[in-house]
Amino acid sequence: MEYNFREIEKKWQQKWFSQNKYKVTEDSPKPKYYVLEMFPYPSGKLHMGHVRNYSIGDVFARFMRLKGYNVLHPMGWDAFGLPAENAAIKHGIHPSDWTWSNIENMKRQLKELGISYDWDREVATCHPDYYKWTQWMFLQFYKAGLAYRKRSYVNWCPSCETVLANEQVVNGRCERCKSLVGKKDLEQWFFRITKYAERLLRDIDKLDGWPEKVKIMQKNWIGRSEGAEIEFEIDGLGKRIKVFTTRPDTLFGVTYLVLAPEHPLTKEIIAGKPQEKECLEFIEKMQYLNEIERTSTETEKEGRFTGGYAIHPLTGKKVPIYIANYVLVDYGTGAVMGVPAHDQRDFEFAKKYNLPIKVVIKGDGVDIQNLQSAYEGEGVLINSGEFNGLKNTEAMKKITEYLEKNGYGKACVTYKLRDWLISRQRYWGAPIPIVYCDDCGIVPVPEEELPVLLPYNVEFKPTGQSPLAYCEEFVNTTCPKCGKPARRETDTMDTFICSSWYYFRYTDPKNSEKPFEKSLVDYWLPVDQYIGGVEHAILHLLYSRFFTKVLYDLGYISFEEPFKNLLTQGMVLKDGAKMSKSLGNIVSPEEIVEKYGADTARLFILFAAPPERDLEWSDQGVEGCFRFLNRLWRLYIELKDKLSDSSLPGQSELDDELNYRLNYTIKKVTEDIGERFNFNTAISSIMELLNFLYDYKEKGSLNRELILKTLKNFLILIYPFTPHIACELWEIMGFEGDIEDVSWPEYDESALVRKNVEIAVQINGKVRARFDVPVDISEEELKQKIMNNEKIKTLLEGKEIVKFIYVKNRLVNIVIK
């Protein structure tokens, strides 16, 4: 009877999914457990990263069910986004048709992997029943003052004639057509995430179940800085430039100011000056560089003098105003003070443009007459008027107080985090539920009129505006306030909005009256185990935390953090690089499943590396896992016939060892899955137990009761990893009930106390023999046993024993000469 994985896997998948085996409700007496993998963009085909992500989640789900939990394990589709629109442009396929076809194919692939989802809870963000509530979320944010519109510089692709999100710009070029990306000033919608910056930062420390590296990444992204906001009067303009600094103690060392080229005051300052033309050319040039390029330490600092001057608030002296590549308009105030003596970036800029360098902090052993680089350390203030002689840490406070008293500044906390730009000039996204009326201005669509549906008949040729702008039946509407003709907002929402609340919708996916019932969300959430790639460590996870806090504040939920525990899995590599079409190193999951089966694919992907590490693909590794499952199959088929003989001998000399190994493996697998996420070592211990079972079968007479107990528990242990073969062998062996309804085995602590132990005997460091001896044997008894052994006697003949070293219960080393 061969291991026919195709037949076995098809049989069990049919049974599971036709019977809704993994459907759950909230009325179970069991404790709840919500395990969730980040839902995929429906590109049409699963890749190995998906297989890894969903296999990890399925181990948790199947394990926790057997541990007695009511497990919610749903799946859905992050279905809006640019690729669908690009497919429409390239192939003439409507984004909706393309997306739903892809969903159908990927759903089939997931079922063929045997992932235990409750498919009754499936959601797709592009379905009107879902995006109706995405639009509802927007309206709640708008009512709470968290959604607003303003002009903003955005990424602009001149070839595609469209705005691009930051993530669609790679090395300064359009991800799709590779054109250089510039900047364009447009009216855009934003979410006021900065209002939540302090809470988002503070509550990171509550996330005990998150990897430290992810918490650090979020802290750095939020980027809290304490300092002062200082105002410099612009000479002759009657306006002020605000700068933020963490070093107000260096204020007397300011010898110039730098504005971002896009700063709203730049054009006013240069207007009519000889430098105007040169500055305008520089501003144009900056539009073709992205933020990473402009702020990189490897990028040469470049600037232009504006011809304007600012008045120093403490000295009254004029300081020149420059524009430069390294200052960004939407970071801080878009302006910085140049203190070349005490900031290395400013030092390099001052040297390049021959600007004065004024030392105002004297550190121990610093030659202030001959600075070779900026001195950024602590010290005592000099050249700082009435503040001379103060320690710089004390001067920070004193100077800030002086500025505040005289109306030139104040103590301030700022964040690197910027408000979330949510407008997208694309078709395939959730329409922003806003109407523009000449009389009433900006008017939100009433909730009862949601969803604002995406029209099907649209033209996808890129023009620089959303395709919706050219769809008259969509654009032309009536004002909900006054009933006069009005125009709909034609931008759609960033797809990150759809994925910032989907985990709530899974709790109540068919509710047509509200996004979710509060009692259901409060029952299931927070998510107990969230699993996804570390590339989502910042944006998706931060936005989800933001959404959760807003919904908590608005009274829709009773908790402030969405994900209790987070596991970020590593990438799947081949030949040391991430799998990609361009490198030609993609391995198709479908081909692996077809050739070896889903259980083999799952086993390899879980065995080859710990979940959080990158995994190197290995054809030999896959073959090895396939051989292991074949060995497992053969053992059970052979033993089934032998165990039908009820007159088997009752005892074997290996019984104690088998019982020990069984209990050890139960303990190891339980802890590796439930506490350490070390699936690879759990599988390794299962493989070792199989090897011993073969030894037991060959060497000992079978203890029927013990071997049946071992075989039964073995299948439960391997079930979360390879469920199809486990279910099939359980049925073949005639074990009682359904393996999916049994309890996870408990280990017997007393069985883990070994009666015998194997001692390796070395002579001059080389293992020459092994002895099976009682655990409590004395050193003298052991020495006698070894010295009486014929093989050892021969090896020691004519030699002098210098030392007899015994490491209890492990080894003996006899040193001879």
Curated annotation (Swiss-Prot):
Coiled-coil residue windows: none
Enzyme class: ligase
Record keywords, A-Z: Aminoacyl-tRNA synthetase, ATP-binding, Cytoplasm, Ligase, Nucleotide-binding, Protein biosynthesis
Enzyme Commission number(s): 6.1.1.4
Annotated protein name in UniProt: Leucine--tRNA ligase
Entries under InterPro entries matching the protein: aa-tRNA-synth_I_CS, aa-tRNA-synth_Ia, Leu-tRNA-ligase, Leu_tRNA-synth_edit, M/V/L/I-tRNA-synth_anticd-bd, Methionyl/Leucyl_tRNA_Synth, Rossmann-like_a/b/a_fold, tRNAsynth_Ia_anticodon-bd
Motif ('KMSKS' region): 578-582
UniProt cross-references to SUPFAM superfamilies, sorted A to Z: Anticodon-binding domain of a subclass of class I aminoacyl-tRNA synthetases (SSF47323), Nucleotidylyl transferase (SSF52374), ValRS/IleRS/LeuRS editing domain (SSF50677)
